[in-house]
Amino acid sequence: MVQDATADGVMDASDACCAPPGNVDSDAMATDLQVLSAMGNDTRYELLRRIANADDGVCVCDLEATVGVSQSAVSQALSRLYTAGLVTRRKEGSWRYYEPTETTEVLLETLDDLRGNHE
């Protein structure tokens, strides 16, 4: 939409084509981007799905055997998911176990709903 200037060349605010954009909470946006970025990698996303689909915490040793990447890559991926608040971890003996957070459960359920695959 082209706006016409008044006789003195100044645009009238009432002629604006749309409302100004709303404010964005920069802290919330940074948190959202951290979460989405953590999910935006094939290995991390697969690990997250496997952890969320397990009945109980998943041992890192079991995850390493299922995703087809090095132990180092799995460790880095799990660390990133933990830092983003998508998984919790606990240590039992020499092993770490990972579980999804409530945030993860809601996000994955929402994605399933959007695809129409909610179980």
UniProtKB/Swiss-Prot annotation:
Induction annotation: Constitutively expressed.
Entries under InterPro entries matching the protein: ArsR-like_HTH, HTH_ArsR_DNA-bd_dom, Metal_resp_trans_reg, WH-like_DNA-bd_sf, WH_DNA-bd_sf
Domain HTH arsR-type: 24-119
GO molecular function, a single term: DNA-binding transcription factor activity
Record-linked SMART domains: HTH_ARSR
Endpoints of the signal sequence: none
Keywords, ordered alphabetically: Arsenical resistance, DNA-binding, Plasmid, Transcription, Transcription regulation
CDD domains assigned: HTH_ARSR
The keyword Transcription regulation is annotated on this UniProt entry: yes
GO biological process: one example: response to arsenic-containing substance
Pfam families linked: HTH_5
Annotation: DNA-binding region: 60-83
Function: Transcriptional repressor for the arsR2M operon.
Name recorded for this polypeptide: Putative arsenical resistance operon repressor ArsR2
Organism: Halobacterium salinarum (strain ATCC 700922 / JCM 11081 / NRC-1)
Originating gene: arsR2
